[in-house]
UniProtKB/Swiss-Prot annotation:
One of its GO terms (cellular component) is cytosolic large ribosomal subunit. Keywords: Ribonucleoprotein, Ribosomal protein, RNA-binding, rRNA-binding. Part of the 50S ribosomal subunit; part of the 5S rRNA/L5/L18/L25 subcomplex. Contacts the 5S and 23S rRNAs. This is one of the proteins that bind and probably mediate the attachment of the 5S RNA into the large ribosomal subunit, where it forms part of the central protuberance. HAMAP family: Ribosomal_uL18_B (MF_01337_B). It comes from Hydrogenobaculum sp. (strain Y04AAS1). InterPro entries: Ribosomal_uL18_bac-type (IPR004389), Ribosomal_uL18_bac/euk (IPR005484). This is Large ribosomal subunit protein uL18. The gene is rplR. Signal peptide: none annotated.
Length: 122
């Protein structure tokens, strides 16, 4: 039986998660792409808590751009800027990037490069 695109992504994500883990001092930066929005979270895997979550549906994004639910590359980069700013406020200066099984291309690549440019990930 042939796997669907989402099943393939989940399979890749599980394989990646075996190797990547976040701590309180260096949390895991995971992301999710839906059809209408982009979500990013900093997660402490030891306690299982999300330290910080930002999305293109959130109040900070709407205040900064004036629109709700962007899914373009520019919207993803704005979400990255907001995430890095809030992380710095919480005292988090480094994170481990988890692409969540998505291919490193397009929006995922733009998000990672923006976070890297702003100094959150190596």
């Amino acid at each position: 039986m042939k796997l669907t695109r989402e099943e393939k992504r989940i399979k890749r994500h599980r394989r990646i998660r075996k190797k990547i883990s976040g701590t309180a001092s260096r949390p895991r930066l995971c992301m999710y792409r839906s059809l209408n929005a982009f979500y990013a979270s900093l997660v402490d895997d030891i306690t299982g808590n999300a330290i910080l979550t930002v999305s293109s549906l959130g109040k900070e994004y709407v205040d900064a751009t004036g629109k709700r639910g962007g899914k373009s590359i520019e919207a993803v980069q704005k979400v990255a800027e907001i995430l890095v700013q809030k992380a710095k406020e919480k005292g988090i200066d480094k994170a481990v990037f988890d692409r969540s099984g998505y291919l490193y291309h397009g929006k995922v690549k733009a998000f990672a490069e923006k976070c890297r440019e702003l100094g959150l990930i190596n």
